Amino acid sequence: MGDYKHIEKCVGNFIASHYTRAVEVGIGRNEEAAQIISNAGALLRCTDVKAPGISGNLPFSQDDIFSPDLSLYAGAEVIYAIRPAIEMIPPLIELAEQINADLIVYHLGFESYEQGGEILDCGVLLHRYHVSQNPSNRVD
């Protein structure tokens, strides 16, 4: 279980240090990354298809990535997901394109979607599948 906390901390620290407006898709019950991002003042909200058992201090909206409510993601610089099911990647990419946000995914093991996007190493390997067209959102 310690490995999962390491992953969450790496993802949370990366997002918090590179973005000011983030949305986590598919939070489930693992809120470590979202807490780090929230503590940095950069978390807009978390979403999941089911109401998860997370702390009441995290902003949460129930939403289905296969039919997203775009208003929940408005203003986000980055959409991120930790260990999403591979079938969630195409609608995540579409959402990121629609709202002009980066999309960053941490996959389980060595999974990836198509070519895997741009690889970002923050202590764990992240896949950036979409890059915002807004130059102020660029992560180098």
What are these language model-derived features?
Residues M1-Y19:
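S-adenosyl-L-methionine
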Residues H18-R29:
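Conserved class I S-adenosyl-L-methionine
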Residues R29-G41:
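Conserved SAM-binding loop of SAM-dependent methyltransferases across substrates and taxa
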Residues L43-D48:
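Conserved SAM-binding motif I beta-strand of class I
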Residues G56-P68:
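Conserved SAM-binding strand-loop segment of SAM-dependent methyltransferases
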Residues L70-V78:
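A short acidic, Gly/Pro-enriched loop at the edge of an enzyme's catalytic core
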Residues E87-D140:
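C-terminal substrate-binding/active-site "lid" region of AdoMet-derived donor-dependent transferases
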